[in-house]
Amino acid sequence: MSKNVFKFFGSLALFAFVLSGTVVKAGTKEDVAKKGSVSCGVSQGVPGFSNADASGKWSGIDVDMCRAVAAAVLGDANKVKYQPLSAKDRFEVLKSGQIDMLSRNTTWTLSRDAGLGLEFVGTNFYDGQGFIVRKAAKVNTAKKLNNVKVCVETGTTTELNLRDYFKANKLKYEAVSFTKADEAVAAYDAGRCDVYTTDKSGLAAQRTKMKNPGEHTVLPETISKEPLGPVVRGNDQNWKDIAAWSLYVMIEAEELGVSSKNIDSMKSTDNPNIKRLLGLEGDTGKSLGLSNTWAYNIIKQVGNYGEVYEKNVGAKTPLGLARNGSPNQLWSKGGILYAPPVR
């Protein structure tokens, strides 16, 4: 075979390789390691989920998800740069590469998962949409919300669920839309709307910002399923795995009774499941491209799922969301939280 033929087939193979889009390049994990921080898209301020205090320090369930990934990859949960995003802009900012992950009380749906080139990595909070009204209105059920003005944030499943619910129940309403949740809440609080709607956890969070929280009540109906969780780009399987298993580790740790407070004393255990979780046996970090202390770092620095929940949204917080009896309890205690085996 002539040299020209070899050159032809060699060029053809290279051309096909380039067209396939499989050109080797650094992944998100490598980018994060190089810059020394995780860029995380969060909300513009939802207490209990992602909210900055007066000093600029961020906290919340979604914030702790970002911190868990940073602990896994960089060994330091504090190496996170937060970027507040509107519901409308969040997906485009993630797709463009401006952030490494999105952890912003975002609902997992078919169209988002399959149609945006993005991947939901799991559910860190199971929620459902509801309504908040003034007690003075003396409305005790959403079925009586007819001919009302409803404040709502654009670019959300909330808008779609609102439309479906009122149509299905033959009720009339006028949507008053805003690009920021805080604007929608402020408008409702100022009396521009009769109702404000979002996920029920969000209603509890936003009520704490109102002038007189005690004057408002959340109606009993839950009109949708809202599995909320972090999102990454769909072209990096390793990064998706890291984000997913960072969540699973927190759930698994709680089930095994391992917390940020007792984790070091657990090193002397004979339980093989705990030994693997803490990196004392096996090589669970290898397949993720991480050190074998990746899970230990998450639990030690961020906590198990129960710790994260109670600290941010639990019964003793301003949100007061009791965990028992909710889907956000471990499967062994009546909830639906379940982590695949860490082995």
Residue ranges and their predicted role:
Residues 80-92, 175-190:
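Short helix-initiation/N-cap motifs at beta->coil->alpha
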